[in-house]
């Protein structure tokens, strides 16, 4: 397929997607763009099933992202959030669905399938090593780290996960945000005062540590939510294994760059 044909197909896909957004928006009575994204008819049954656990409309609304924005779904896995972000930013926006090689393997082909055949033409699927991350200054409106911020502190001895230069990655994310840009963090809560010390063993991180980590890079907390709280979670089990899986207490923080 030549470049002209591919561009034509993508243009047609964008027009079709824009029309679908328009229809979905007009049909969603009293629904804002975040509810409309969650209610979009193009979403899979598996994704919809996750919504009751992840409450994505509340997280998206708290982020304040708008049509036309450039956003990153960082360590996106299979791209559950990437698709929702695609519907919110619309055909004039851009979503980078980013995985490192390990997360791409974890997705078991889900990320590739999600964007196959230009299904989401405003989503770019990229796989790259995080060492180094070199995004240009003031190039992004938002970066979402959904249950993956703790992984930047994961030290693995089995070869499954490469050691990340965490400080450099966080510095570059802050550098790449436009003034007014936001970082959205959703993660599994560790016990207060544990910092990042259980990131490897329990795949959790302390909320106060996360707040200070981003504030030290000049960002300010501008939003938080208790929508994903589970006060019954003892915070002492591995987040992705029984009995904690699907039942963890999770914090939601939004940071803005001045």
Where are these regions (language model features)?
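A short acidic, Gly/Pro-enriched loop at the edge of an enzyme's catalytic core
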Residues: 133-143, 147
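Short glycine-dipeptide loop
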Residues: 68, 91-93, 177-183
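S-adenosyl-L-methionine
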Residues: 107-137
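Glycine-rich SAM-binding Motif I of class I
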Residues: 79-83
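Core SAM-dependent methyltransferase catalytic element
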Residues: 232-258
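Class I SAM-dependent methyltransferase Rossmann-like catalytic core
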Residues: 34-62, 66
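A short glycine-rich, Lys/Arg-flanked "PGG" loop and its adjoining helix->strand segment in the class I
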Residues: 86-87, 160-179
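Conserved class I S-adenosyl-L-methionine
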Residues: 68-77
């Amino acid at each position: 397929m030549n470049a002209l044909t591919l561009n034509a197909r993508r243009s047609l896909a964008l027009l079709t997607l824009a029309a679908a957004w328009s229809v979905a928006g007009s049909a969603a009575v009293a629904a804002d763009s975040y509810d409309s994204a969650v209610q979009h008819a193009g979403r899979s049954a598996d994704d919809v099933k996750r919504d009751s656990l992840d409450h994505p409309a509340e997280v998206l609304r708290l982020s304040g992202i708008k049509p036309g924005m450039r956003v990153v779904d960082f360590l996106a896995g299979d791209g559950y959030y990437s698709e929702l972000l695609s519907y919110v930013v619309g055909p004039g926006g851009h979503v980078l669905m980013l995985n490192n090689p390990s997360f791409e393997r974890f997705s078991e082909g889900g990320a590739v399938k999600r964007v196959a055949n230009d299904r989401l033409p405003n989503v770019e699927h990229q796989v790259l090593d995080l060492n180094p991350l070199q995004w240009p200054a003031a190039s992004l409106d938002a970066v979402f780290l959904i249950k993956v911020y703790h992984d930047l502190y994961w030290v693995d001895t089995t070869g499954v996960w490469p050691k990340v230069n965490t400080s450099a990655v966080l510095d570059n994310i802050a550098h790449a945000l436009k003034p007014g840009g936001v970082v959205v963090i959703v993660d599994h809560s560790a016990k207060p005062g544990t910092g990042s010390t259980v990131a490897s063993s329990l795949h959790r991180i302390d909320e106060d540590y996360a707040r200070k980590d981003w504030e030290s890079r000049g960002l300010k907390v501008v939003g938080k939510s208790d929508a994903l709280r589970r006060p019954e979670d003892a915070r002492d089990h591995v987040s992705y294994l029984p009995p904690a899986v699907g039942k963890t207490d999770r914090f939601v923080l939004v940071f803005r760059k001045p």
